[in-house]
C-alpha cells in the first residue's frame, strides 16, 4: 500500500494553495533583495592604518561609514570611566536585559555614520531617516570595546534633554547601579551623559572609525588654536599700549581645549584586541586627564619664552610672519623666515610652535626641524612643550577623547562658551600687547 501511495504521487505536481504561498514568498524575497541592492554607495574613503585623511576633507567635506545602530542610553552618570570595559558593558548588559538594546543585530539595524569636523550624524541605511546628530564639541570620548564577536564603538556624549523618546533609550535599569561599581563615587548632583552604542563589522572597521574621529578632534583643535594664536599675537604685538604681567591674574577665565594630538598615527591606532575573559580585559582609551591642556597656558608659556629671547621689534616681526602664514604663505616660507629671525642661537624656539601647526603642514615642519638640527632634548622649549609629546607616547590605552561633555546644570549658570572665548582672547591679547612696553621698561 505504501508503494502504491508513493507511485500515486506524481512528481512536479504542486497544490494550488502551495503555489500561491510559494509565489508570495518568492516575491517578498525578491523585493527584499532588490531593497538591499538599491542601497546607494557611501561617500567614504578606505584607510589602511596608519594612513590618514587630508584635513581639508574633514573641514570642507564629509565621510560616511556603515555601522549598526543599537541605541542610545541616557541618564548615565557623567563620571563613567570610558576606559573601563567592565563599566561600559555593565550598562549595555542591563539595557539588553530590559529590552532597551537589541540582543541580536539584523539588517534592520544597519545605519550610516556621516562624519565631518562639525558633527557626527546617524541615519538609517534604508530610507536614510536621521536618527540623531551630535556636534563634535558634545563628544567627550570614543571607546572601542570588543565583546565576544561584537565590535562595539561607544560615543560618550553630552546629555541632550531635547532628544525625542523615539531616538533615545533611557537606561532606567542602570540607575540602580551601585556607586561602588563605577570608577568614581557620586557625591552630590551627578552630571548626566549619554552613550551612543554602535557596532562595526570587524576590529579593523572599529579601529578605522576611532582613527577618523581622532583626526576630527585634532583638526578642530588645531584650527581653533592657531586662529586664536594668530589673532592674539598679531593684534597685541602691533599695537602695544600698556603693561601687564603674563601671569598677573590667576583668576582670569580659562577655557580648557583639548591638546593637539600626536601627529603619528599610533595615537589613534589600536594594535591590541580586547577579548572577553582575557588576562586584562579593557576598552581602548586615553583618559581625558592625559590629553587635556589649556590653550591659554600653551600660549602664555610660549609668549613668556619669546619675551625673554626676542626684542620688541622681533616680536612684531614674528606676529607679521604668523599673519602672513595664516593668510596663504607656505609653511616652507614661514619656517625659513622664522629661522632667519631666530638665528642659530635661538632656533630651538621653533619647537614651541609645534602645537599650533596645522596637521597638513606638520610633517613639513617636523622635517624642517630635523634639517636644521633641532630635536627634542635641546633648549628650554623642549621642557615646556615637549612634555606633551612625551605624555602621549607613554599612554598605555587608546580611546580618542574630544572636548568634555557639556550640558550639565553647572554650564547653565556659567557664562556661555562664546563669552569665555572672547574673554580669554582679550586677556591673552592684553598680555601680549604688554611685551613690547615691558621689555622697553626693563632695558631702561
UniProtKB/Swiss-Prot annotation:
Glycosyltransferase among keywords: no
Modified residues (Phosphoserine): 15, 164, 384, 393, 396
Modified residues (Phosphothreonine): 394, 399
GO terms for biological process, alphabetical: blood vessel endothelial cell differentiation; cell-cell junction organization; endothelial cell development; endothelial tube morphogenesis; endothelium development; heart development; in utero embryonic development; inner ear development
Record PROSITE patterns: PID (PS01179)
Transmembrane domains' residue ranges: none
This protein's GO CC annotations: cytoplasm; mitochondrion; protein-containing complex
Involvement in disease: Cerebral cavernous malformations 2: A form of cerebral cavernous malformations, a congenital vascular anomaly of the central nervous system that can result in hemorrhagic stroke, seizures, recurrent headaches, and focal neurologic deficits. The lesions are characterized by grossly enlarged blood vessels consisting of a single layer of endothelium and without any intervening neural tissue, ranging in diameter from a few millimeters to several centimeters. CCM2 inheritance is autosomal dominant.
Assembly and oligomerization: Part of a complex with MAP2K3, MAP3K3 and RAC1. Binds RAC1 directly and independently of its nucleotide-bound state. Interacts with HEG1 and KRIT1; KRIT1 greatly facilitates the interaction with HEG1. Interacts with PDCD10.
Name of protein: Cerebral cavernous malformations 2 protein
Amino acid at each position: 500500500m505504501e508503494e502504491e501511495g508513493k507511485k500515486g504521487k506524481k512528481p512536479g505536481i504542486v497544490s494550488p494553495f502551495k503555489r500561491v504561498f510559494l509565489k508570495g514568498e518568492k516575491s517578498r524575497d525578491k523585493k527584499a533583495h532588490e531593497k538591499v541592492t538599491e542601497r546607494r554607495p557611501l561617500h567614504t574613503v578606505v584607510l589602511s592604518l596608519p594612513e590618514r585623511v587630508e584635513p581639508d576633507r574633514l573641514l570642507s567635506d564629509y565621510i560616511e561609514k556603515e555601522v549598526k545602530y543599537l541605541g542610545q542610553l541616557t541618564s548615565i552618570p557623567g563620571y563613567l570611566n570610558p576606559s573601563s570595559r567592565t563599566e561600559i558593558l555593565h550598562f549595555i548588559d542591563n539595557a539588553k536585559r530590559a529590552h532597551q538594546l537589541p540582543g541580536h543585530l539584523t539588517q534592520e539595524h544597519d545605519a550610516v555614520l556621516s562624519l565631518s569636523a562639525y558633527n557626527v550624524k546617524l541615519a538609517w541605511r534604508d530610507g536614510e531617516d536621521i536618527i540623531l546628530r551630535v556636534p563634535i564639541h558634545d563628544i567627550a570620548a570614543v571607546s572601542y570595546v570588543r565583546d565576544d564577536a561584537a565590535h562595539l564603538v561607544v560615543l560618550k556624549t553630552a546629555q541632550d534633554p531635547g532628544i525625542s523618546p523615539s531616538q533615545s533609550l533611557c537606561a532606567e535599569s542602570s540607575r540602580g547601579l551601585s556607586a561602588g561599581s563605577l570608577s568614581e563615587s557620586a557625591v552630590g548632583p551627578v552630571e548626566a551623559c549619554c552613550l551612543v552604542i554602535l557596532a562595526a563589522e570587524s576590529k579593523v572597521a572599529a579601529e578605522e572609525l576611532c582613527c577618523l574621529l581622532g583626526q576630527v578632534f585634532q583638526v578642530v583643535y588645531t584650527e581653533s588654536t592657531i586662529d586664536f594664536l594668530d589673532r592674539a599675537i598679531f593684534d597685541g604685538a602691533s599695537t602695544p599700549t600698556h603693561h601687564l604681567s603674563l601671569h598677573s591674574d590667576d583668576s582670569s577665565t580659562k577655557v580648557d581645549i583639548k591638546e593637539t594630538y600626536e601627529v603619528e598615527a599610533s595615537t589613534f591606532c589600536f594594535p591590541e584586541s580586547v577579548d572577553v575573559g582575557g588576562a586584562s580585559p579593557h576598552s581602548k582609551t586615553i583618559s581625558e586627564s592625559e590629553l587635556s591642556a589649556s590653550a591659554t597656558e600653551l600660549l602664555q608659556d610660549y609668549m613668556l619664552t619669546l619675551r625673554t629671547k626676542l626684542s620688541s621689534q622681533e616680536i612684531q616681526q614674528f606676529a607679521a610672519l604668523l599673519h602672513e602664514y595664516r593668510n596663504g604663505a607656505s609653511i616652507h616660507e614661514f619656517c625659513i623666515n622664522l629661522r632667519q629671525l631666530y638665528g642659530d642661537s635661538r632656533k630651538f624656539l621653533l619647537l614651541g610652535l609645534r602645537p599650533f601647526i596645522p596637521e597638513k603642514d606638520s610633517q613639513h615642519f617636523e622635517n624642517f626641524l630635523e634639517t636644521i638640527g633641532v630635536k627634542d632634548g635641546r633648549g628650554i622649549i623642549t621642557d615646556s612643550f615637549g612634555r606633551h609629546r612625551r605624555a602621549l607616547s607613554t599612554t598605555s590605552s587608546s580611546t580618542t577623547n574630544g572636548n568634555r561633555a557639556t550640558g550639565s546644570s553647572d554650564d547653565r549658570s556659567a557664562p556661555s562658551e562664546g563669552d569665555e572665548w572672547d574673554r580669554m582672547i582679550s586677556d591673552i591679547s592684553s598680555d601680549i600687547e604688554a611685551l613690547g612696553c615691558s621689555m622697553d621698561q626693563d632695558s631702561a
